[in-house]
Amino acid sequence: MIIPNGDRAVVGSDTIVVKDGEVFGKPKDREDAIRMLKALQGARHSVYTSLSVIIEEKGKVKEYKEVYETYVYVKPMEDSEIINYVDTYNVLDKAGAYAIQSKFAVYIERLDGDYNAIVGLPISRLYDIFKENEIW
């Protein structure tokens, strides 16, 4: 992005889901998505979201590299609920095969951490970085 004063900033963010040491990226197909949700239901898992910001200001570069962990507790789900969710929503582009901001929210018992990081971008922290650098 070009900042009004002519400086530049690049923002990147990505997310993975981890349960019992197994990494759940984006599912490769419908069956993989069902497998992931069956593993995640009825238990706690971690969502890791990275945030990388590079700011060029007057020829100098500032870098911010951070990782956020949020614990998500998913209610027990029936197989029919999992299949319905997978068949109704585009889950193939979501780490762990779910989007917390979709209908899947009804299956969330609670979370400990940053909701926006689970969605994919820790926006509050990004705002702080921009504010600190007088971009916002």
Q: What residue ranges belong to the model's regions?
A:
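Anionic-ligand binding patches
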Residues: 1-136
